[in-house]
Amino acid sequence: MPVAPQKIVILGGGYVGLYVAWTLEKHSELPLEVTLIEPRAYMTYQPLLPEVAGGHVSPRDVTVDLRQALAHTNVVRGAVTGVDSKAKTVTVAPVDGGETVYDYDHVVIGLGAVTRTFPTLGLAEHGVGFKTIEEAAHTRNTVLLNVARAAAATDPAERRKYLTFVFIGGGYTGVEALAELSDLSKKAIAAQPALAGEEPSWILIEALDRVAPEVGPELSAWTLDELRKRGIDIRLKTTMKSCEDAVAVFSDGDEVPFGMLVWTAGVKPNPVLANTDLPLGPRGHVNTSAKLQVIREDGGWVRGAWAAGDNAQIPDLTKPQPAWYPPNAQNALRQAVLLGDNIARSVRRRRPRQYIHYSLGTVASYGLFHGAANIFGVQLKEVPAWLAHRGYHLLAMPTTDRKVRIFAGWVADFVGRADLTPTDDLEDPTRDFRVAAGGK
């Protein structure tokens, strides 16, 4: 008599979702029925979003089509709206509307994180995040469009506004994005004769006393000096109070009209977790053991529930307790592989293994030939760090197809001129037709 397959439902198609499904597909000898639920049809390799903004990599080349990558997984486009761990069900809102309920034997919570914001007046109207491929492309288009607007402006104040760009949050992701976009703006201005002699104004607001703390104290201080040498106005121990009417009001009393404001002030666990009965930690993460099992306050396993990545609070056993693994791609990828294997071990009625990982370090790129890296305690700067950044992420990028595309894009970037082509019309593709049809 055939054995009924174990139903595995994976929530989220990021690092965790993709690599858990990949790992489970390798256990083809087991009776598994794997379903992955994700609102988008692709996984985004987020560490290369700054290179997308800078124009060194095509947006689609940092994405992986989930259906193509996962030949034996049922990929469902939809948004998770709830999890009932007692009934072992997941509620989903599919892209075609309605509501679907999936029952499971094992559920993987890999919903990731979203941009963390604060109640700041004007932020929703005038700000943009930097967590998705769409946001990265939008910031690039906005820089190029604002340079074109500045070239056409006759009012000096209006011109200065278009050439003023504000970043809120100085973690290394924000610093990487700012560095790439700053270089892009200078190239775009150089291509505009009407802007001869003009310089863009880039402002970085950071509440802490340092930037890019992830690379370590010494490289953080070096990064601060390096960015200031490039003309970037960095204000430490400063916050933004409001940004109504595209005027940023800072805690130091300064008021700055701006053409673009990018918010990179951290992330928080996916708020969908609040609609579940899963045990959450003090900051909204799923309470998770070192075996990547979702656990209650008493340490007992929520039967069949697993979690990893940015939405999970996982103890770092390499450090004195309490300590938690930071939310980054390095951990998410490795946790996902172990999680997939642990589910397979559970199906075989074997004990799951603990997640123990010593950090490889951090690599950051600050534009072409610039960067900082701390690899196993060895500090690198400028070209060596930049090469380490590209080499690491080329190897870490999922699928051979995407690796080849990214490398080819880098080669073309060296051989050709800087790509200053705006694609802002893609953000409103029906505009010309609406006008032609008599609309607005």
Regions found by a protein language model. Give the residues of each.
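C-terminal, flexible cofactor-proximal segment of oxidoreductases
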Residues: V3, N331, Q335-K440
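A Rossmann-like FAD-binding core segment of flavoenzymes
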Residues: E33, T73-V90, S182-R296, P352
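Beta1-alpha1 glycine-rich phosphate/pyrophosphate-binding loop at the start
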Residues: M1-G82, F165, Y172-V215, V262, ...
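Rossmann-like dinucleotide-binding core of oxidoreductases
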Residues: E158-V215, W222, D233-R235, Y325-I343, ...
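Short glycine-rich anion-binding loops that position phosphate/pyrophosphate groups of nucleotides
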Residues: V16, G112-T115, L178, V267-P269
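Glycine-rich, N-terminal phosphate-binding loop of Rossmann-like dinucleotide-binding domains
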Residues: G13, P94, L111-G112, D252, ...
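FAD-site-proximal beta/loop scaffold in flavoenzymes
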Residues: E125-T154, A248, E255-M260, T264-R334
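FAD-binding core/adjacent interface of flavoenzyme oxidoreductases
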Residues: M1-P5, N74-V166, V262
